[in-house]
């Protein structure tokens, strides 16, 4: 539930909901800004009711290709176009054992 989770985040952090985006297919995204951090809350009809849960983290990096080349393809997927225009995304492989899904996002400089 987007509003329930958003309200809980606002109570815990003082950061109000800044924007809600309809992402299509009944998926909604809500955004909170905590300083330089953007927290994205996502909900969809296929999500089970219950308490809010953490799906994963996305970190913005200056040069996503440099990070991908540094850690290698066994650790991080090859950067590909993200849903956000002009952005690239790469995900850490589950075999790395981070426990929570982690992705990196950077500008598409091509």
Q: Model features per residue range: what roles?
A:
Residues 1, 18-40, 48-110:
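Vicinal oxygen chelate
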Residues 2, 6-9, 15, 32, ...:
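Short, structured motif recognition centered on aromatic/hydrophobic residues
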